[in-house]
Amino acid sequence: MAKWVYMFTEGNADMRNLLGGKGANLAEMTNLGLPVPQGFTVTTEACTQYYEDGRQINDEIMGQIMEAIDKMEGITGKKFGDAKNPLLVSVRSGARASMPGMMDTILNLGLNEEVVETLSQASGNPRWAWDCYRRFIQMFSDVVMEVGKKYFEELIDKMKEEKGVKQDVDLDADDLKKLAEQFKAEYKAKIGEDFPTDPKVQLMEAVKAVFRSWDNPRANVYRRDNDIPYSWGTAVNVQMMAFGNMGDDCGTGVAFTRDPATGENGLFGEFLTNAQGEDVVAGVRTPMHISEMEEKFPEAFKQFKEVCKTLETHYRDMQDMEFTVEHGKLYMLQTRNGKRTAKAALKIACDLVDEGMRTEEEAVAMIDPRNLDSLLHPQFDAKALKEATPMAKALGASPGAACGKIVFTADDAVEWAERGEKVVLVRLETSPEDITGMKSAQGILTVRGGMTSHAAVVARGMGTCCVSGCGDIVMDEANKKFTLAGKEYHEGDCISLDGSTGCIYDGLIPTVDATIAGEFGRIMGWADKYRTMKVRTNADTPADAKKARELGAEGIGLCRTEHMFFEGNRIDAFREMICAETVEEREAALAKILPEQQGDFE
């Protein structure tokens, strides 16, 4: 019989293909003796089987899930569905590749009216009990039954307005009990049946919902953008709840062992008291910096710092962690190698070598070459970018950052640039005739076209920032204006483009030039030291060739001569040659082209 379910004590970090990244790391943390609430993982193979069985969980998988629940009951001393001493669980997704925020989570599963009443009395904390229940109804309705969050948020906002408070935490137990009743009524109105009270039914529906979320639109987009195969499937992690919302001696947080933006070595993260995990991410309340946790929970913070050190030393990489503090006791809910900027990736890789955790070869292998490309182009000033909000997003067709005054024709781009203006060329689409304007512009924005359009290909070749295919733009070329995000832009107005992300910003955001120095220089030096291939460049002009040599190229590998004929009168001679109807006409055109080409190579 196939094994579809693994307890955390049965897995390890090497089983991520089967257990997913989250499940494998929960098992690894358990093996390391760290404080992890116990649970089990339903494998990625079970997800694949679910789809093969027509989006149904078969009896064999269902049986193994319930066997694992029995084992959890034995470990915890609690009973699933029992009113007196209930086992409450979270149900989370966990693909083998990290997909933050792409799939779904359900907390506090196992609650019903009877259990909540008992918990309310037994804990002496009715507010906590009803808060858990209203959260569970909202999550289950949204994730499992696809009743939108907005309906429940509207009820919460109405309740806060009636009570004259601004924060969810200011609602008392009676308020939350009323909300739970309103939520159940909303559920019945939308679904046509009562909210399920049987924890086993709740669990199976939640597992199916997580499997389903592997195929949701945002997960599909993320997989496509990050080359993650659909066939991998997701695992499901069922874990005993640790409660961060039981009072002021409880809390929840997300932290990195190093700063994911800069790579600086030091704890970076956020923390909320009397809250559950999604509150930090959702921005329901403004979280505190992780350092403030030391004042609130000194013992838990001391233990957390030790856990961070253990995990980073064990994984030999910067870690991204989720945790909960329940009555001063620390529980680890997740760890994974943290996402980071290209700049941070370089610093972290170099620091890990200096700290003796990685070899030079390993440090080079840690760097995603696709991210390095963004460092070779001008970048927005980090502080200024943090304060800016994009007004639209299209295709990041050519990396880098650009800001300047809007122009609508290639000729205007040349003219404005010659008098010292920095310009962004905005076109419906570009053509070869626009090449001079494209060269004069700081950046290019097109309404039509994709990653392989003329604008994208030429811009990448020139190292010019380009955002293409912004279909939200309503263009009026005749009057030199366009409308975007409800605002009308005219020639001379300022915009900023991020060719790495495709984001478009109103106004000017300061940029800084890229340099190969510091950590970038060290990594590239190590790459040169250990590589077995020579690196040459594609270059069509002396300026391109010079820049390539500055960036480490050893010579010219490809020179596409046709690109030399995009400028001035050259393109006319080239067209004469192509359109020539007689040998004499062709030879006459070639006679014009030959000295130009000879001059380029000389």
Per-range role (PLM):
Residues 283-285, 347-352, 447-448, 513-528:
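A signal for specific C-terminal beta-sheet/loop modules enriched in small/flexible residues
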Residues 333-335, 490-538, 544:
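C-terminal domain-closing interface element
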Residues 393, 397-492, 501, 564:
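Conserved structured catalytic cores and adjacent interaction surfaces
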